[in-house]
Amino acid sequence: MGTLIILEGGDGSGKATQTKLLVERLTKEGHAVESVSFPNYDSGAAMPIKMYLAGEFGKDVHDVNPYVASSMYAIDRFASFRTDWEEFYKNGGIIIADRYTTSNMVHQMVKYDDQKERTAFLDWLEDFEFKKFGLPTPDAVCLLDMPLEVSEALMAERTGKTGGNTGDIHEGNHQYLVAVHDAYEELVERYQWHRIPCAIKDKANQYALRTIEEIHNDVYQAVVNLLP
């Protein structure tokens, strides 16, 4: 089997950039490596996800049950695995994923306030994707930890450049995003993810973004010992 490394984090945390840099570095080192990104919007399997995020099943994130929403995302990952990277992975290749089941965990668990319901959901999701669907379990998860206030500022800048609303019911709900950001802490502890800080406070107690290179080096150091 191969190696599966996940880059996780909220919007604006730089997952795509860090995925690209890690793939480039590992390729230069002679590793067989490919990248994937979820949801895979180029696949027909992602159509229900597009409808969900566009609010066609309900304008509020709580309108769709976490188990139903999770099923949509699981099918998308299953289709990607079976058609795009299963053979490469099973032959020992390294897969760098921009989001994975990990995103489903955080975005859906926050729909529950009760800790027992959250734990039951996470247990179910692990069994559903990694056993029922047979998807690979990650070897490492790097959480690109971006302070929410910085992330929202970056998202506002990005939205301004692209001309308005992203059409994503998740991104449009501030209270939901706060809950997601806070819930990452629970997942870091439960699954022993690698936390990679994307911003640090300066002497004026203001957040300052770390450089892309600094973040990349932290990601690399977190996974280098896993490489074949």
Predicted regions and their residues:
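ATP-dependent small-molecule kinase phosphotransfer cores
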Residues: 29-133, 208
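NTP-dependent small-molecule kinase module
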Residues: 23, 149-228
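Hydrophobic positions on the alpha1 helix immediately C-terminal to the Walker A/P-loop
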Residues: 18
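P-loop (Walker A) phosphate-binding loop of NTP-binding proteins
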Residues: 10
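A glycine- and Lys/Arg-enriched "phosphate-lid" helix/loop adjacent to the NTP-binding pocket
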Residues: 102-182
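Extreme N-terminal, non-catalytic leader segments
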Residues: 1-3
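Hydrophobic anchor at the beta1->P-loop junction of P-loop NTPases
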Residues: 5-7
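Conserved lysine of the Walker
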Residues: 15
